[in-house]
């Protein structure tokens, strides 16, 4: 297996795990996510009751597409979802300054420019994945390695804000 398809496999698992992490966080605190939709977008109770689980289900559907062998469709769906979400939340961030997202269950922390940067980096990675040619199904040991590296990338993405702060010089 050449490098391109292997990197594509890593990316596929990365996006699968990222979508599963986002959906799981929302489903674990669906009431909190519904409340967050009200504060972020001013949604009424009826719309929030539908939108909150629909977002989580859409994230799960992207993971299923990617795991089911529809990599191109899954990556396109992930790119579209993340692009729309980042644009909406980015607009709110720049117009209101204090925005709570809670995409990965961190509702107590305000959104920062680092979160938007993370999303842009994830979208760039997805774009790179879309540019990869469709490969053959890798052997099991290659798939396990790709999934492991995708998992590592997912942990870095989910905790990007905290990792950057840990690696930044402190003020004293």
PLM regions: where:
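Membrane-interfacial helix-loop segments of redox and metal-homeostasis proteins
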Residues: 1-171
């Amino acid at each position: 297996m050449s490098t391109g398809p292997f990197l594509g496999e890593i990316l596929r698992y990365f996006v699968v795990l990222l979508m599963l992490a986002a959906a799981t966080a929302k489903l674990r605190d669906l009431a909190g996510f519904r409340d967050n939709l009200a504060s972020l977008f001013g949604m009424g109770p009826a719309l929030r009751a539908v939108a909150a689980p629909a977002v989580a289900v859409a994230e799960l559907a992207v993971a299923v597409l990617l795991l089911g062998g529809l990599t191109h469709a899954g990556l396109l769906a992930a790119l579209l979802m993340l692009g729309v979400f980042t644009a909406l939340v980015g607009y709110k961030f720049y117009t209101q300054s204090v925005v709570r997202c809670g995409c990965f269950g961190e509702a107590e922390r305000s959104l920062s420019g680092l979160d938007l940067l993370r999303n842009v980096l994830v979208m760039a990675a997805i774009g790179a994945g879309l540019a990869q040619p469709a490969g053959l199904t890798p052997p099991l040991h290659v798939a396990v390695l790709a999934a492991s590296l995708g998992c590592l990338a997912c942990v870095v993405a989910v905790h990007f804000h905290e990792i950057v702060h840990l690696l930044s010089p402190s003020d004293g």
